[in-house]
Amino acid sequence: MPSVKVFNIKGEAVGQTELSDSHFGVKPSTSLVHSVVVAQEANKRTTKANTKTRGEIAGGGRKPWKQKGTGRARQGSIRSPQWVGGGIVFGPRKERNYSVKINRKAKQAALFMVLSDRVSHDKFVVVDNFPIDTPKTKSFAGWMKVLPFGRKSLVVIPASNPTLLRMVRNLKNVQLVTVNALHVADLVKYPTVIFEQPSLAAFEKLYSKA
């Protein structure tokens, strides 16, 4: 059963906590993690580009010239795709759906694998508490400097906290997420994961049946 140190905001080790093997001691599978990340990124994608077909462009109802006798190629509408300003063939459409289905068990397994990897490489940190009595970005940045890990970190808290969010949102190398919003795609972007100690209990409860 893996165990990690618990730190306070001064960077001092104040204890140790054990982690469950089923969640933090899982053997990694690069291919599974990759497929889940690709799917989660695809599911975030929205379609903005939208081209018009010849049926959606205004005008072009009249035949530009008669069928025969002009010496020119026959044309039926100035909104045909070969005309400048005509409809687009096979262009991007806003109704295109990029979403990819992910099995729940596969998504959970990939999540446990990435967390297990962070634990095995000493990139998983537990902090006893983030005090919010001084809700300043400067305060949170100061904690990040003294804690024993890299500055670029994903911080996991048990539930939504608007005060902490305000403290973190201007720090470009720190992202704040709640336990139930923790995704593999977010985890792989940050080399270090920081769990506030109550988040561990919330995580274990959320995935107790996994």
List where the protein language model places each region.
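Extended polybasic, low-complexity segments that bind anionic RNA or targeting/receptor surfaces
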Residues: 1-46, 92-210
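A short, flexible low-complexity segment enriched in Lys/Arg and Gly/Pro that occurs
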Residues: 30-68
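Glycine/serine-rich anion-binding loops at beta->alpha junctions
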Residues: 54-91
